[in-house]
C-alpha cells in the first residue's frame, strides 16, 4: 500500500472515530454538567493540567523514538526496530515509576492550586484517579508509537470506537443512576486499562518480527541521533507544558474554578474540531518523513506550501465558525448564557487557536525532519513570556488576558524563528517567502472573521434554532466564497481539492462496502 493510500486511510478512519467520539463526548458532557455542575468540570480540567507537569519527565522520548523508527521500518530492519522498542519500553517503565512517586509528592501541594474552600467532594480520589490513568499509559501504551510510525494507526480505530462507545454509555448510566463523580472516574480507569491491553495485543500480533524485550544494542549512529533529539526535546517538553497547561492554572488561581469549568466547554468543542484537523496532519506525518528523507529541497518546499495553504483554508473556516457560533451554540442551544464568556474573550480565544493552527505545518515538518535541537529554546522562551504576560493581563482583562498572553508569547518567539530553522535546515532557501504568506494568511483570516461576524450579528430571528441555522450558513459560506475566489487558480488550492476528492472517494468506498 502506498504512502498516499495509507495516509488517506489513516485520515478517513481516524476522522470517523473522532466524529463518533465527539458526538458521544457532547452527550456525556451535557449529562455531566446538568448532574454535577461546572465546578467538577473545572476540577477535571485543572487536575489534567497539574498532572500534565509530571509528563515532562517523558522528555520527548516518544517523539524521538518515533522519528528514529521511520527508516528501519521502511527498510524492514526489524533488528533495529526491536532494539529501539526495547529501549523505549525500559525508559517508559522508569518514567512511569518516576511519575507515580512525583505525583504522590505533588498531592501535598494540591491546596496551592485549589483553595480547600473551593475543592468539591471527591477531589482526593479524583487526583489519584487522574494520576493512575497517567501512569498506566507509560506501562501499556508505548507500542502505539510503533504502529503510528509505520503509518498503520488506522488499524487500531475499531478497538477505539468500540471502547469509546462502551465507556461513554457506562459513564452516562453511572451519572444518571448514582450522580457520583468517583464512580464516573472509576469507569474511565477500567476502560482505559482495557483499551490499552487490546491495543497491545493487536500490535504484538501484527509485528511478530519485533522483539519488544530485545537485548540487541542500538547502532552508534542511532544512539547519537536519539541523544541529540532527546536533548532538544527536553526543553521543548518543559516549554510546551508551560504554554499549553498553565491557562487553567492561572484562571483557577486568579479568577475562579467555575470560570475554568466554563472555559472547559469552549475547550471541549475546540478540541473536538481540532481533533479532526490534527487527524489530517498526523495521518501524513509519516509520509512527510519519507518525503524529507528522499525528495529534493524544491519538492519538500512545494509539499510544505501545500500544507500551509491547507492549514490556512481549514483553520480560517474553523475560526470564522468558532467566532460566530461559539456563544449562540453554548448559550442559546446547549447550556445557557451563564456558561458563556463575553464576545471579546471569545474573539481572543479564537485568534489564539487560529495562530496555533497556522503553526501546524511547521510542527509537522519539524517532526518529520527531526530538527529538534535547532530551536530548543523557543518553547522555553515562549512559556516565560506567556506566563508573565498572562499573569499581568488577567488582572486587567480577566480570562481574555490569559489567552492574549499566549498570543504575545507566540508572536515574539515561535512565529518568527521556527520558520527560519525549517527553511534554512530543510529547504535551504530564504525564509522571506514564508513570512509574506504568513502575514497574508493572518490578514485574510481576520477579514473573513470580521465579515462573517457582522453578517451574523445582522441576523435577528425570533426562533432560536432557525437563527442558529442561518448563522451556520453565513459562517460556512463567507470563508468558502472568499478563499475560493482568491485561490482557485493556485496549485495549492488544486492540491487541496484533489485531497478532498480522494477522501470523499475513500469514504464512499467504505460506505458501499458496508
Task: Write out the residue ranges for each language-model feature.
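N-terminal membrane topogenesis motif
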Residues: 1-26, 79-86, 121-123, 199, ...
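Interhelical loop/hinge segments that connect adjacent transmembrane helices in multipass membrane
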Residues: 1-7, 183, 199-245, 287, ...
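Short runs within selected transmembrane alpha-helices of multi-pass transporters and secretion channels
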Residues: 17-25, 29, 47-55, 59-66, ...
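Interfacial/gating helices of multi-pass transporter permease domains
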Residues: 32-56, 84, 181-186, 221-229, ...
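Helix-loop junctions and terminal segments of transmembrane helices
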Residues: 59-75, 149, 208-212, 266, ...
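Alpha-helical transmembrane segments of multi-pass membrane transport and lipid-handling proteins
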Residues: 89-116, 169-176, 197, 301-357, ...
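Hydrophobic transmembrane helix module of multi-pass membrane transport proteins
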Residues: 91-239, 244-245, 453-454
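Membrane-proximal transmembrane or re-entrant/amphipathic helices at the cytosolic face
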Residues: 427-430, 453-514
Amino acid at each position: 500500500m502506498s504512502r498516499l493510500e495509507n495516509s488517506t486511510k489513516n485520515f478517513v478512519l481516524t476522522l470517523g472515530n473522532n466524529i463518533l467520539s465527539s458526538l458521544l463526548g457532547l452527550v456525556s458532557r451535557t449529562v455531566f454538567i446538568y448532574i454535577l455542575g461546572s465546578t467538577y468540570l473545572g476540577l477535571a480540567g485543572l487536575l489534567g493540567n497539574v498532572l500534565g507537569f509530571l509528563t515532562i519527565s517523558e522528555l520527548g522520548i516518544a517523539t524521538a523514538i518515533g522519528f528514529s523508527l521511520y527508516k528501519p521500518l521502511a527498510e524492514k530492519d526489524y533488528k533495529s526496530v526491536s532494539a529501539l522498542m526495547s529501549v523505549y519500553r525500559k525508559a517508559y517503565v522508569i518514567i512511569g515509576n518516576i511519575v507515580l512517586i512525583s505525583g504522590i509528592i505533588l498531592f501535598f501541594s494540591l491546596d496551592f492550586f485549589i483553595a480547600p474552600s473551593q475543592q468539591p467532594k471527591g477531589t482526593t480520589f479524583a487526583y489519584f484517579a487522574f494520576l493512575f490513568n497517567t501512569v498506566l499509559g507509560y506501562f501499556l501504551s508505548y507500542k502505539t508509537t510503533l504502529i503510528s510510525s509505520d503509518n498503520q494507526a488506522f488499524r487500531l480505530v475499531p478497538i477505539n470506537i468500540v471502547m469509546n462507545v462502551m465507556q461513554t454509555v457506562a459513564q452516562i448510566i453511572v451519572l444518571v443512576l448514582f450522580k457520583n463523580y468517583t464512580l464516573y472516574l472509576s469507569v474511565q480507569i477500567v476502560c482505559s486499562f482495557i483499551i490499552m491491553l487490546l491495543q497491545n495485543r493487536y500490535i504484538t500480533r501484527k509485528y511478530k518480527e519485533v522483539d519488544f524485550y530485545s537485548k540487541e544494542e542500538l547502532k552508534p549512529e542511532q544512539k547519537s541521533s536519539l541523544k541529540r533529539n532527546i536533548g532538544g526535546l527536553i526543553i521543548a517538553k518543559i516549554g510546551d507544558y508551560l504554554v499549553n497547561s498553565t491557562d487553567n492554572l492561572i484562571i483557577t488561581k486568579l479568577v475562579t474554578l467555575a470560570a475554568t469549568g466554563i472555559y472547559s466547554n469552549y475547550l471541549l468543542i475546540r478540541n473536538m474540531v481540532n481533533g479532526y484537523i490534527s487527524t489530517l496532519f498526523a495521518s501524513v506525518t509519516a509520509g512527510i518523513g519519507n518525503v524529507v528523507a528522499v525528495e529534493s529541497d524544491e519538492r519538500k518546499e512545494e509539499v510544505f506550501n501545500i500544507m500551509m495553504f491547507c492549514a490556512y483554508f481549514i483553520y480560517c473556516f474553523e475560526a470564522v465558525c468558532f467566532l460566530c457560533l461559539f456563544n449562540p451554540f453554548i448559550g442559546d442551544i446547549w447550556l445557557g448564557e451563564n456558561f458563556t464568556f463575553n464576545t471579546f474573550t471569545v474573539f481572543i480565544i479564537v485568534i489564539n487557536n487560529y495562530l496555533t493552527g497556522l503553526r501546524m505545518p511547521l510542527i509537522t515538518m519539524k517532526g518529520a525532519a527531526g530538527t529538534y535541537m535547532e530551536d530548543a529554546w523557543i518553547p522555553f522562551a515562549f512559556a516565560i513570556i506567556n506566563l508573565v504576560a498572562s499573569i499581568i493581563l488577567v488582572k486587567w482583562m480577566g480570562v481574555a488576558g490569559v489567552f492574549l498572553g499566549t498570543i504575545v508569547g507566540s508572536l515574539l518567539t515561535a512565529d518568527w524563528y521556527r520558520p527560519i530553522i525549517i527553511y534554512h535546515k530543510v529547504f535551504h532557501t530564504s525564509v522571506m517567502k514564508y513570512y509574506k504568506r504568513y502575514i497574508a494568511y493572518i490578514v485574510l483570516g481576520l477579514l473573513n472573521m470580521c465579515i462573517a461576524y457582522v453578517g451574523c450579528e445582522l441576523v435577528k430571528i425570533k426562533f432560536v434554532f432557525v437563527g442558529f441555522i442561518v448563522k451556520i450558513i453565513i459562517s460556512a459560506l463567507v470563508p468558502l466564497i472568499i478563499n475560493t475566489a482568491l485561490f482557485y487558480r493556485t496549485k495549492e488550492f488544486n492540491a487541496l481539492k484533489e485531497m478532498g476528492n480522494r477522501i470523499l472517494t475513500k469514504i464512499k468506498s467504505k460506505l458501499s462496502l458496508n
